[in-house]
A protein has these predicted regions:
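Conserved acidic carboxylate
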Residues: 11
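Charged docking surfaces used in two-component/phosphorelay signaling
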Residues: 18-26
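Acidic, metal-coordinating helix/loop segments flanking the phosphotransfer/catalytic sites
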Residues: 33-53
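Acidic catalytic/metal-coordinating carboxylates
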Residues: 36, 64-69
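Active-site residues of response regulator receiver
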Residues: 57-58
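Short amphipathic alpha-helix used as the core "switch/output" element in two-component signaling
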Residues: 67-80
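C-terminal output helix
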Residues: 108-121, 125-126
């Protein structure tokens, strides 16, 4: 299990957390779940090189949203792979979207999430 890429997931809805976690495990990833943006940033800072990708809900309860968590991840690594999830309109995507990221609109199939993370990691590997 140690050779599986660890993906940090920040999602405040337990039902969606469970779906995302199950999908990532089935896809060969090791998910690390953070229920808030603040906790996700703490985990990122504490394990700067331990996470291979971030899956972030755009709209989170609390002081920090998914865009803010992604900004912190990109401070650590400007090319950090990020999958954004949103149930809202994607209107803000052009303003916030950054290279090496994918936006998934809820609801999405679990396989779409696995494909998105895999694609970002493959793209990152081929650039290196």
């Amino acid at each position: 299990m140690a050779d599986q890429p660890v993906v940090l997931v920040v999602e405040d809805d337990q039902g969606i957390q469970s779906i995302v976690e199950d999908a990532l495990v089935e896809g060969g990833f090791e998910p690390a779940i953070a229920p808030s943006g603040e906790e996700a940033v703490t985990l990122l800072r504490g394990n700067r090189n331990g996470y291979r990708a971030l899956v972030a809900d755009v709209k989170l309860r609390g002081r920090m949203d998914g865009w803010e968590v992604a900004r912190h991840a990109r401070e650590i690594d400007p090319e950090f792979p990020i999958v954004y999830m949103t149930g809202a309109s994607a209107d803000q995507w052009p303003a916030h979207g950054v290279p090496n990221s994918i936006l998934l609109q809820k609801p999405f199939a679990p396989a779409q999430l696995v494909t998105a993370v895999s694609q970002l990691l493959i793209n990152r590997t081929t650039k290196a």
